Amino acid sequence: MKIYITGLPSGYEVEHLVRLFYPMAPLTLTPPENAEDCVWAEKTPDGLHALVRQDGRSAERHAPLPAPVEQGGETPEFSLASLTYDLLRDWTGIRPPWGKMTGVRPVRLIHDKRAAGWTEAEIDHFFLDRFDCSQQKYQMAKAIADLQEPILKVGNEPGTYSLYIGIPFCPSRCSYCSFVSCNLDRDRKLVQPYVDCLCREVEAIREEA
């Protein structure tokens, strides 16, 4: 299985979503052969096209070009990624738990939408319908956002400040994530030295503050 994307300045979103279904599929810069297994996503002046071909069978989907973003439309990148995702979800029977999310922090999105005045129903629609996020993952993200909210509000009061502490180790990689740094299985030996240094740094910051 190969991934071929054409017609976009960047095919990152399409490539990332295809790998939710075919994790080892390489990206190719040349059109696949006629009988070659592939996912082919394309933007042309006529519209958006997505095709999957595997084991002698194939399926495809088409959509018109989206309206400009300033008129309420989606970006061509997201529209083509979404079209390809829908095709592959039907083709494989797989539903990724985080849906179409790529390179975003879901909890941060909830905070941003609430700060922008969105209703809870609008946020529900944004996650469950636009991104096809599973109910279980969305409810988890909402629970974390609800837990964080009073703490974040206190951080905006006079005489307080927020301190971001980075923990660059993950036991696994979330499907939406594009910035995981250290895999726990591979880099476990670095965890304790990192935490020891982090504790010393936090102590020093407390003394300065």
Segments from the language model and where they lie:
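Accessory, often N-terminal, substrate/partner-engagement and coupling regions
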Residues: E74-R95
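Canonical Radical SAM [4Fe-4S] cluster-binding loop centered on the CxxxCxxC motif
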Residues: T160-P193
